[in-house]
């Protein structure tokens, strides 16, 4: 598992990309998908996940749908059109940043 520091700068991009690829999802489902995709190396906590989801919703990047599942309420998150365009922008920024960091550190990314 990675330390939380590198994750802080990439959390938004991770969430946007997962939602782009998988459509509407609820919070726990997002955490499990990220854990699966990262082969267990990234564990999202509620303390990092939900504030970011709420921020993205407030900025108009996400829309929500509340569904009653038995006696529980489940809140689903999905990208808006603006959120879908932000995914591309954030991915390009991240790839450029990784390239720059690898140059600065003089390491080759494989």
Language model features with spans:
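Intrinsically disordered, low-complexity serine/threonine- and proline-rich regulatory segments
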Residues: 1-7, 90
